[in-house]
Amino acid sequence: MAVMTREDVEFRTMDGLTLRGWLYPSGMRGPALVMTQGFNASKEYLLADVAVWFQKRGVTSLLVDIRTTGLSDGEPRNDIDLDKQVEDCHDAVSFLSRHPSVDPEMIVYWGYSLGAVISLCAAALDKRAAAVIATAPNTDFIFDPVKRAATLSLAMRDRLSRLAGNPPLYLKIIGEDGQNPAGWYLGEERRSPEELDALFNSSNIMNQVTIQSYYRLLRWQPFGLMPSVSPTPVMIVTPSDDDLSKPENQRKLFDIFQEPKEFVLAENKGHMNCISGEDGEQFLQKQLEFMKRMLKF
């Protein structure tokens, strides 16, 4: 049996940044995943075990730190730009297509949470992808209206301050009260502050982003692109107990796509544990079977 390895890799983006992360080569020429994380999430958070799972089954996976986070380039730090992340997915495909373990005709966009929507946008614009798999796509960007207004006002003040040469303003993702300071509802806020600190520390996640990250999130309108995903094959995996992105809205998203497509309802699973644990492996298996049918390997 081949020894499974993990390679430290880096590649350049079209605008000149270097993104760094991990490659899990299958050891044989074949399919590959461009894996995309959720909002400000690190490569260490949740998906490394998923990459190993696919690697053991003959699928190469690429998992990198989002630009401006972790080991990847970009200033200011933790300045999240979802549109740029879509572009980075395209450059990841270009990088993977040159790797000896990857058949460039068998590269799949794979995303989780907000990364699932980013992956769908990438697939809508890049027909090099053989398929796209979206797990728990974030369809609901629910902000408290009062905090939303305050966040946008703060973002405008930050623009003036930055033009004057000052450093960027940062907001935490989860505050000491367990809430998102910008008013964005996040499933993680059900954890205690102590649990959240442990989560951020163990996953190498900075519990802050620039105020302009929230400005970009509030202006982001990805769903107009969704009809353009077709005819690329698409799979949506929806947790039945998702309290961050309503399952019925994920189903409505799925209904936009044309065949070939597949919808999987992950019973008794939530947004953050959809594909983890022993009972989560069955949904990874369904993804693998979908890939085998669509890519014919």
Swiss-Prot record:
Which UniProt keywords are listed?
A: Transferase
Please verify whether the record's keywords include Cytoplasm. no
- Please give the Gene3D superfamilies that the UniProt record associates with this protein: 1.10.10.800, alpha/beta hydrolase
> Pathway, per UniProt?
Mycotoxin biosynthesis
Q: Name one GO molecular function term.
A: transferase activity
EC assignment? 2.3.-.-
Q: Which first-to-last residue range defines the signal peptide? A: none
Identify the stretch(es) annotated as Abhydrolase domain. 49-272
Q: Which InterPro entries match?
A: AB_hydrolase_fold (IPR029058), Hydrolase_4 (IPR022742), Polyketide_trans_af380 (IPR051411)
Q: What this chain does, per the record?
A: Polyketide transferase; part of the core atranone cluster (CAC) which products are predicted to catalyze most or all steps of atranone synthesis, starting from geranylgeranyl pyrophosphate (GGPP). The initial cyclization of GGPP to dolabellane is probably performed by the terpene cyclase ATR13. The Baeyer-Villiger oxidation near the end of the atranone synthesis, which converts atranones D and E to atranones F and G is predicted to be catalyzed by the monooxygenase ATR8. Of the CAC's other predicted gene products, the reducing PKS ATR6 might synthesize a polyketide chain.
Family as reported in the entry's similarity comment = Belongs to the polyketide transferase af380 family.
Official protein name in the record? Polyketide transferase ATR5
**Source taxonomy lineage?**
Eukaryota, Fungi, Dikarya, Ascomycota, Pezizomycotina
